[in-house]
Amino acid sequence: MLLIGCLVVVAIALGFYQEQLKISINYILENAPRIAGFYGLNEEQKHQAIEAQRFTAPFDYYHSHETLRWLYKMNELQLLRLKWAVTFVSLLVFFVINASLLRLLEGNSRVLTRLALIYLIFTTLAFAIYAVGKLMSMPDQTYAISRRITGALQSLVPVMIFWPFLRLSKQNNT
């Protein structure tokens, strides 16, 4: 039981950090084009420019905290690559956490194949939706959908849905 509790705490902490990281990356990527010569500025100048813009813009409920300062060392391409890397690493880490929790809760590893299939299907769906949006020149609309799908996979949502489903299936089969 202690291990389950530890995994849940780790998942919550990692979830908050990866979300803060991606929000900061997105905020910089979205606002940098509004600042002349942004990527030519040094780290402190980038930070000051973004923060000055944040204080003059309407309140952003999604990004109401200061960005992670170490991100200002990166250029646009590095930020884009980091965003994708964080997405893939988070998917993998949360798959391992969800798989570990299911293994501990169920006591067998047969459910892990099903969980892997669920992750594969929904990850493929999310990236297909995003790709179609890019091809149809409407990436903002499809990004929001794919972000919600991958966001659910980068959390404890899979185990919160899958484990009760497994328990109900066992009860119905007995």
Protein language model features and the residues they cover:
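Juxtamembrane "helix-exit" motif on the non-cytosolic side of transmembrane helices
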Residues: L104-E106, Y130-T142
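Non-cytosolic membrane-interface motifs at loop->transmembrane helix junctions
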Residues: D140-L153
